[in-house]
Amino acid sequence: MEVEEAGAVQTGTGEAVVANERTKQCSAFASITGCDEAVAQCFLAENDWDMERAINSYFEPGVESTLQNKPAADLADPLKQEMHAVTSDACIDLTSDDLVATKSEAVTSNSSTVKQQEDESHFTFLTWNIDGLDESNVAERARAVCSCLALYTPDVVFLQEVIPPYCEYLKKRAVSYKIITGNEDEYFTAMMLKKSRVKLISQEIVPYPSTLMMRNLLVANVNISGNSICLMTSHLESTKDHSKERLKQLDTVLKKMMDAPPSATVIFGGDTNLRDQEVAKIGGLPNTILDVWEFLGKPEHCRYTWDTKLNNNLRACYTSRLRFDRILYRASMEGSQVIPQFLNLVGTEKLDCGRFPSDHWGLLCDFDIIL
């Protein structure tokens, strides 16, 4: 694509910078949506070069007529087809009792679900790397994630590796949740807070200055059943080679947890990419911060959240079983206590496409509120 044809002014240093930036935007848009750069240019120009608005516009149901007029070769792009199918679905209240009752035979009755939802003495929490960067079978996998939300109706959800189209899909499907994100471009973390249970007080994004992978710490101060809770999620630097940066990021997380007001319970959850030896290398966690899996007696059934022995999404030719996804907890030093009670894996059922919702298992945790 010629920059001149994109309508950019051809002269002047400042204008050249704008043209270069718009070229980059076209490339990023094309990468996220799977369209070619000419189509990207059209959507961006129509939306005043606002990336989020352009992506939302592209994935609106009204884009169907545009796609129908495109060559068959363009329609064959898997990501475009699947994400278009996803975002064409009607809005669904994922905490609806009827939906929960029909999503799985594991739910034996509506009454028990409703009772659980109305019980102010506990809340449920889910953290999950949903692998939005994997374009394969993304529609079926996204629906499976929403089925898990409908089944378990967690009050708080932390997600990692969310991409803009996936986020828009969740906003359309999960209308019972308020969704806040750690970024808007490329891929990022997100929190989903059930509107009927969780009151958002404030939010903050804490940067990791030396990250090479656009990682940060998303923080939300909330109130659940009268209890002040500081929620934190992050996707720490990936791969064994980036251990040093990962531990710097962990240090930021731990300091932020310890600096939270003493009246607040602090819950961190996310894809930490941590190896046990890395935690040992820094002398373990501070005395006031607990690893929930360890606190609950190291249950074997949910030890590994990254498990290529059982999860074939990566199609790895090796076996790797690691506890990448972790929940850390700092108790309130005043008033009522929020105590972790139970931990389980989600997303472990293979889908019709032969794959799982993500290459990670999700971690579902029940917390009791003790007055």
From Swiss-Prot:
Residues 129-133, 235-240, 273-275 are annotated as: Interaction with 5' end of substrate DNA. The record marks 187, 306, 324, 360 as: Interaction with 5' end of substrate DNA. Keywords: DNA damage, DNA repair, Hydrolase, Magnesium, Metal-binding, Nuclease, Nucleus. Coiled coil: none annotated. Binds 1 magnesium or manganese ion per subunit. Its main location: nucleus. InterPro entries: Endo/exonu/phosph_ase_sf (IPR036691), Endo/exonuclease/phosphatase (IPR005135), TDP2-like (IPR051547), UBA-like_sf (IPR009060). Mg(2+) binds at residues 131, 161. CDD domains: TDP2, UBA_TYDP2. GO terms for cellular component: cytoplasm; PML body. The active site is at residue 271. Belongs to the CCR4/nocturin family. TTRAP/TDP2 subfamily. This is Tyrosyl-DNA phosphodiesterase 2. It comes from Xenopus laevis. The gene is tdp2.
